[in-house]
Regions:
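Pre-recognition alpha-helix immediately N-terminal to the DNA-recognition helix
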Residues: 61-65, 92, 130
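Regulatory, non-catalytic segments
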Residues: 88-103
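…primarily DNA-binding HTH/wHTH and HhH modules…
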Residues: 114-140
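Basic nucleic-acid-binding alpha-helical/helix-turn surface characteristic of O6-alkylguanine DNA
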Residues: 1-87, 138-140
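Extracellular LysM carbohydrate-binding repeats and other cell-envelope/extracellular binding modules
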Residues: 103-105, 111
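Histidine- and aromatic-rich ligand-binding microenvironments
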Residues: 70, 101, 116
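Residue-level signal for inorganic ion chemistry
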Residues: 66, 80, 108-109, 131
């Protein structure tokens, strides 16, 4: 799995075009039965998902830190920055999180502002809120 996103904000064709532009040599496929098992693995914390992530060294460190946030938990951008030993790089952490190529699989939606605000979300704040409510970690 190299990419996973949501199409509600930009539409299916625009999302597909974005992936094709980035991954010119890859064959794309809609695979709903596989997606269900991936979603279950993320929600339960059980199961394996073979992923291939491409990013800068800093981005991959941030994305790996996100993989340690269990379903039902939330954290902050500053907590992630501290966990990767870059406590002053909160904005850079936010930028790296915003570039997450595997929405939901790498659970960037579980990161909030220190104030408790939702912050941004690449696929829309409404979707971020809905996922957090579903996971039981957000009541707002």
């Amino acid at each position: 799995l190299i990419g996973l996103g949501f199409t509600n904000e930009i539409g299916y064709l625009a999302a597909r075009q974005e992936l094709v532009k980035k991954w010119r040599q890859v064959r794309f496929r809609i695979w709903p039965e596989r997606l269900e098992s991936w979603v279950n693995a993320v929600l339960t914390g059980k199961g394996n998902i073979e992923i291939h992530i491409v990013g800068t060294k800093f981005q991959t460190i941030v994305w790996q830190a996100l993989m340690h946030i269990p379903s039902g938990d939330i954290t902050t951008y500053s907590d992630i920055a501290e966990s990767i030993n870059h406590p002053r790089a909160v904005r850079a952490v936010g930028t790296a999180i915003g570039q997450n190529p595997l929405g939901f699989i790498i659970p960037c939606h579980r990161v909030l502002q220190k104030s408790g605000g939702l912050g941004g979300y690449r696929w829309g704040v409404k979707l971020k809120r809905a996922m957090l409510v579903y996971e039981g970690s957000y009541k707002g």
